[in-house]
């Protein structure tokens, strides 16, 4: 049995964990990255593709002896339409990819889960506070911008249209910009063990907004929000019960709205305010790149497993547990 994934995002962690759990490993990656990935001895086979259709062909070569692990690059670059052509079984719920590609559906799901979310504005004319405008898909913050009022919001939206980053204003989501500390809560929902695990917390490091603090206040540069890295974090323990409650609510709602439900890793991307409120502004329905911080396990995964347990390894551990209990079909779609 092969564990395979796309060469990007969190692929090193995923395949490192798969090898630790005794699986063969394979990677499908753009041709220009083949040399880089071949240096890692835990990757058994590396396939370079010229275009996304060829990537799907390589993935489908493993239809009878492989399991594909999805991550953000599969969602964003291979795309939901091509994912529908993938015959190889996918770990997790592939039906969730369509929801993740649509910002409005994502927020609707969070609202249904009774999770606190930022105020949203359907019409730029209604903006009366600081807002952030987000593009669809898993773009790592590319194209996102902050606006202080409706005038700045409309100006920024017109630029996105001119640059063809969006086709319609209906594609974006306009959210209140919540002031606080960003915290991205990483979970794993185990179908086999019937439990939800908090796997870690990270903070995204974004350019250029995180570099602007080093400049004098009188230098005016428009901030951008492109994710380039991640910083580890732990939360006040008193926050964790609410974090866990939100995770449970999310799992229950996905089971109801997106059958067969939440399988494996996901992330609730949040801001913690000075009042201790946790406001969730987005979710990822698969492994997130912030888990790369914890290849040797996080402060939280150690509490569940008492051994090094990355999210990548946790995925393969779940697959192994499913195989051993004859429940593999319950964790694949």
Swiss-Prot record:
Amino acids binding 5-amino-1-(5-phospho-beta-D-ribosyl)imidazole-4-carboxamide: 9, 73, 230
Entry similarity comment: Belongs to the phosphohexose mutase family.
Catalytic activity, reaction form: 5-amino-1-(5-phospho-beta-D-ribosyl)imidazole-4-carboxamide + formate + ATP = 5-formamido-1-(5-phospho-D-ribosyl)imidazole-4-carboxamide + ADP + phosphate
Cofactor note: Binds 1 Mg(2+) or Mn(2+) ion per subunit.
Residues binding Mg(2+), per UniProt: 269, 282
Domain ATP-grasp: 94-324
Gene3D superfamilies: 3.40.50.20, ATP-grasp fold, A domain, ATP-grasp fold, B domain
GO terms (BP aspect): 'de novo' IMP biosynthetic process
ATP-binding listed as a keyword: yes
Pfam annotation, one family: DUF1246
Function comment: Catalyzes the ATP- and formate-dependent formylation of 5-aminoimidazole-4-carboxamide-1-beta-d-ribofuranosyl 5'-monophosphate (AICAR) to 5-formaminoimidazole-4-carboxamide-1-beta-d-ribofuranosyl 5'-monophosphate (FAICAR) in the absence of folates.
EC class name: ligase
PROSITE patterns in alphabetical order: ATP_GRASP
Pathway the protein takes part in: Purine metabolism; IMP biosynthesis via de novo pathway; 5-formamido-1-(5-phospho-D-ribosyl)imidazole-4-carboxamide from 5-amino-1-(5-phospho-D-ribosyl)imidazole-4-carboxamide (formate route): step 1/1
Domain of life: Archaea
Coiled-coil region: none
InterPro entries, alphabetized: ATP-grasp, ATP_grasp_subdomain_1, IMP_biosynth_PurP, IMP_biosynth_PurP_C, IMP_biosynth_PurP_N, PreATP-grasp_dom_sf
NCBIfam families: PRK13278.1-1
Transmembrane segments: none
GO molecular function: ATP binding; ligase activity, forming carbon-nitrogen bonds; magnesium ion binding
Native source species: Sulfurisphaera tokodaii (strain DSM 16993 / JCM 10545 / NBRC 100140 / 7)
Designated name of the protein: 5-formaminoimidazole-4-carboxamide-1-(beta)-D-ribofuranosyl 5'-monophosphate synthetase
């Amino acid at each position: 049995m092969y564990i395979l994934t796309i060469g990007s995002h969190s692929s090193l962690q995923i395949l490192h964990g798969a090898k630790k759990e005794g699986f063969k490993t394979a990677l499908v990656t753009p041709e220009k990255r083949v040399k880089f990935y071949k240096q890692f001895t835990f990757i058994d086979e590396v396939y370079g593709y010229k275009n996304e259709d060829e990537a799907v062909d390589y993935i489908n070569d493993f239809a009878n002896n492989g399991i594909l692990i999805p991550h953000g690059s599969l969602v964003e670059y291979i795309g939901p339409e091509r994912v529908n052509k993938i015959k190889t079984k996918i770990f997790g719920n592939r039906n969730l990819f369509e929801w993740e590609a649509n910002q409005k559906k994502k927020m609707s799901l969070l609202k249904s889960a009774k999770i606190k979310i930022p105020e949203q504005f359907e019409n730029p004319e209604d903006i009366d506070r600081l807002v952030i405008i987000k593009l669809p898909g898993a773009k790592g913050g590319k194209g996102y911008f902050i606006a202080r009022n409706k005038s700045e919001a409309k100006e920024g939206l017109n630029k996105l249209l001119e640059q063809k980053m969006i086709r319609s204003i209906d594609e974006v989501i306009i959210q209140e910009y919540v002031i606080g500390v960003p915290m991205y809560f990483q979970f794993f929902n185990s179908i086999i063990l019937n439990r939800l695990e908090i796997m870690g917390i990270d903070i995204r490091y974004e350019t250029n907004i995180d570099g602007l603090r080093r400049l004098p206040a009188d230098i005016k540069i428009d901030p951008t929000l492109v994710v380039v890295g991640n910083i580890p974090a732990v939360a006040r323990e008193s926050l964790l019960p609410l974090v866990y409650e939100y995770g449970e609510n999310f799992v229950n709602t996905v089971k109801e709205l997106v059958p067969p439900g939440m399988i494996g890793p996901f992330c609730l991307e949040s801001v913690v305010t000075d009042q201790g409120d946790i406001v969730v502004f987005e979710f990822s329905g698969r492994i997130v790149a912030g888990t790369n911080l914890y290849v040797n396990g996080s402060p939280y995964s150690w509490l569940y497993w008492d051994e090094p347990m990355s999210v990548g390894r946790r995925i393969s551990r779940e697959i192994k547990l499913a195989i051993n209990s004859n429940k593999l079909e319950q964790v694949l779609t």
